[in-house]
Amino acid sequence: PSRARLDNRDAANAPPVDISVNHAVTITVQDSIELFRVAETNDGTYAPLGDISTLNRPLRIGFAPDSISGTRVSPETTAALEDVAQLCRDLGHEVIDFKVPLDGKEFTDKFLLYWAAGAAEFAQQASAYSGKPIGPDIVEPWTLGLAAMFQARQSEMEDTIAYLKAFEAVYDDWFSDMDVLLTPVTGSPAVPIGEQAPDGDFDAVMESVLNFAAFTAPMNVAGAASMSVPLSWSSGGLPIGSMFSAKRGEDGLLFELAMQLEMTRPWIARTPPVSAL
């Protein structure tokens, strides 16, 4: 959901740039809509979501299958996104190729430093709670590595925060000639359990994380409306999400599109080989 669209009782303690997301993963679009309505804020920042019906007009959708930072995207993910783009065309939407106008390496570098600051704060809290110095006895290698990254570049934090705060306006400019942006959610289908375990080799985990989580960060930083829709399936029988994003506040538009997509390609009867449903 758009930043501050849903009730956040801890808003007074929010960090300088709130990159967290307050919502849930639901089985149906209607479930997501109902939860959204219950949790909406009523402070006047946004109009109430109101009634949502299936989209009945064509949209201009930007198609951006490549990672902004140049990390690899699996062929299976790319093929799934191309199929979803064609689905959108079949529904009457105009799909245009879109090159994200962003220095992806700079953005990723700033985002990682900001993320590392959170790990450093957690490590300090763990040390204070345990009475032990920060080290492998109290935190895992992943947290230690991120904390060390922050300590080495702490002097850059002021500029990093300013850059990330300014990004919201940069993001909104992307939509001057389109309604919605279509990208992968992740760089590959779900990775094996343990590949990104925090007790693994730091460099190996970082490489896996950067390749996998290569698309969501801009939307988190911008506080944008964004959704993952499970329209595709991997060769291993796992869902592959497609991410549709819009300007902040355009949550209703995304819900309308989601309802149209769900009616056209329903997923409720499909489950992975191992499922709790």
Where in the sequence are the language-model features?
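Short glycine-rich, flexible loops that bind phosphorylated cofactors or substrates
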Residues: 70, 189-190
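Short, surface-exposed loop/helix-turn segments at secondary-structure junctions
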Residues: 191-213
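Short, well-ordered beta-strand elements
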Residues: 238-247, 255
